Swiss-Prot record:
It is found in: Cytoplasm. It comes from Serratia proteamaculans (strain 568). Specifically methylates the adenine in position 37 of tRNA(1)(Val) (anticodon cmo5UAC). InterPro entries: DNA_methylase_N6_adenine_CS, SAM-dependent_MTases_sf, Small_mtfrase_dom, tRNA_Adenine-N(6)_MTase, tRNA_adenine-N6_MeTrfase. NCBIfam families: tRm6a37MtseTrmN. This is tRNA1(Val) (adenine(37)-N6)-methyltransferase.
């Protein structure tokens, strides 16, 4: 029997902005801290990119699929108005519990609800509710299992295939909504092709490389069910030759990273 729990956050922060200093056991942002010691997948550049880049439009209901530590949900809470509600769905109970704790510590504790359950079950009860859906999904095909089952589930597509992810998004999204993902570049190409086959349209695409002279290694996609009036495709190099961040990357993350 599938064990489920839903965490309703009920603590109100007394300040809209926090003056954070770096802490151990997680990642410190300008307005919030993300502990990730109980999560299989730690805070990384992929999640930060998606949280900072995802187009918001006029989204009132937001869903983060496979939320992990709650990183992307927290970033989107920072970027949106006080009336925007965010649901974060995470299959792993330890990660969901840590996401819950991270939300409680944040300034947006009334706006984020963490659900520890399978997205397929969640979709059955929340069909057609979300203007914006985001996901930093697993992408490795089944192979040699990790010793850590939670890490295996977070990295491999056995618990959430990309076809199943698209099907869930189709069920959950409103007709004019946007579904955003971040994936390795080659896997993202296949994901985009499959999405088009299923009736999705690419509204925005961001191709990411470590440096301007290196191959693209990540792609961020914003998909819609309706054809985009004007689809856009951009490139982003994260670092310069000397290892420092590019101006484009700094602009993207300036509201989040402590020292920019």
């Amino acid at each position: 029997m599938l064990r489920q729990f839903c965490i309703q956050v009920v603590i109100v922060s007394t300040q809209s902005k926090a003056n954070f200093t770096p802490r151990r056991g997680g990642f410190t942002f300008k307005q919030f801290f993300v502990a990730h010691d109980r999560c299989a997948m730690k805070v990384g550049t992929d999640g930060v990119l998606l949280g900072a880049w995802a187009p918001l439009a006029q989204a009132q209901r937001v869903l983060d699929i496979g939320s992990g530590s709650g990183l992307i949900a927290l970033m989107l809470a920072q970027r949106t108005a006080e009336n925007v509600q965010i649901d974060a769905v995470e299959l792993d109970e330890a990660a969901a519990a840590q996401a819950h704790d991270n939300v409680l510590e944040s300034p947006w504790s009334l706006r984020i609800q963490v659900h520890a359950q399978d997205i397929h079950h969640f979709a059955q009860h929340h069909a057609g509710q979300y203007d914006l859906i985001v996901s930093n999904p697993p992408y490795f095909e089944p192979a040699v299992a990790c010793r850590d089952q939670a890490r295996h589930n977070a990295r491999y597509t056995e618990t959430l295939t990309h076809d199943a992810l698209l099907a869930s998004a189709e069920q959950l999204i409103v007709p004019q909504g946007t579904f955003c993902v971040v994936l390795p570049h080659d896997i993202g190409e296949a994901f985009e092709t499959n999405a088009h086959r299923r009736g999705w349209h690419t509204a925005q695409r961001l191709n990411v490389s470590d440096r301007a002279d290196t191959p693209m290694h990540r792609v961020l996609l914003a998909l819609t069910r309706q054809p985009a009036e004007e689809a856009t495709e951009q490139k982003l190099a994260i670092k310069l030759a000397d290892g420092s961040y590019t101006d484009d990357f700094r602009r993207l993350i300036t509201d989040f990273y402590l020292f920019y």
